[in-house]
């Protein structure tokens, strides 16, 4: 293996979403669900109790913006690579006055795109750094990521409102501090990370969007078969994705035990700029990236489809993949 390559010939599983408690959201007790969704006027704060599971911080940040992993909580297996040479840390502040920890990972020189990665609900940046380095190496992309409020070295408490403020602050830092223009930023959201990714993509014109195991909304995860977005619903990505204007790749395992496969299909169908999706037969919520098709599809998406599709007019009823208009006047 050439110098600087991540250890191993394939991607290791992300620690992004460890097995959920009691079998995941679909097996939460009726009492828990009543407490979760039927206690206005603060449904979003109640949702947070089940949606967010921040671990004990796995890292610290030095005064000169270096990442220090805490032994026993996170590891850097790439022995041939000096982490200090390719990983930079920053702290930014959100509009809700929380401090958010961010990392810029540069596995290779002269990468064209930067992934803005939003991780799962039970990890922090320290635990994700090794995976993000490997992902960037295999895709020839820089990777910029951040911790949600209440995770890692970020202050505050995790909540839906903070999710949106966190990604906005990270996005602004990526542009201002690192000089990355919008047209070279690819959003990548995994699991709960698809929620802020869809929100930002619905407001900004970016290079592309990757949605890995997305959810339609909180109510639809907790109550399978729900077809209406209620006023108390949290994380309503299904209502925002029709406003996305950049090429969008949806990835989902057909046997996902946490966020049902139907969520990925519905997000794909509602997005006016979705490209050929990656449905991984037999994959669950935590092992999609172990399949060879994962990296293959991401490479082709980034090399051939990122920045290629643009919606020319707002989509008012994007319910079918046959109702998409793209900039060259063709349909897909």
UniProtKB/Swiss-Prot annotation:
PTMs per UniProt: Palmitoylated on cysteine residues located in a cysteine cluster at the N-terminus which promotes membrane localization and localization to sensory neuron endings.
Variant or mutagenesis effect after changing residue 36 to S: No defect in starvation-induced thermotaxis plasticity. Impaired starvation-induced thermotaxis plasticity
A Pfam family that the UniProt record links to this protein: Hydrolase_4
Gene Ontology, cellular component aspect: cytoplasm; cytoplasmic vesicle; endosome membrane; plasma membrane; sensory dendrite
Biased composition (Low complexity): 1-15
Gene3D superfamilies in UniProt: alpha/beta hydrolase
Disulfide pairings: none
Lineage top rank: taxon: Eukaryota
Enzyme Commission number(s) from the entry: 3.1.2.22
Record SUPFAM superfamilies: alpha/beta-Hydrolases (SSF53474)
GO MF term list: palmitoyl-(protein) hydrolase activity
Impact upon substituting residue 191 to A: Impaired starvation-induced thermotaxis plasticity
Record annotation: effect of changing residue 39 to S: No defect in starvation-induced thermotaxis plasticity. Impaired starvation-induced thermotaxis plasticity. Loss of localization to neuronal sensory endings
Membrane topology: Lipid-anchor
Any one GO biological process: behavioral response to starvation
Residues of the active site: 191, 256, 285
Catalytic activity: S-hexadecanoyl-L-cysteinyl-[protein] + H2O = L-cysteinyl-[protein] + hexadecanoate + H(+)
Expression across tissues: Expressed in a subset of neurons including AIY, HSN, ADF, AFD, AWC, AWB and NSM, hypodermis, pharyngeal muscle and intestine.
Region (Disordered): 1-24
Major place of residence: membrane
Compartments, record wording: Cell membrane; Cytoplasmic vesicle membrane
UniProt keyword list: Cell membrane, Cytoplasmic vesicle, Hydrolase, Lipoprotein, Membrane, Palmitate
Family membership: Belongs to the AB hydrolase superfamily. ABHD17 family.
Job of this protein: Hydrolyzes fatty acids from S-acylated cysteine residues in proteins. Acts in sensory neurons including AWC to regulate starvation-induced thermotaxis plasticity and salt learning behavior.
Name of the protein described by the UniProt record: Alpha/beta hydrolase domain-containing protein aho-3
UniProt organism field: Caenorhabditis elegans
Gene name per UniProt: aho-3
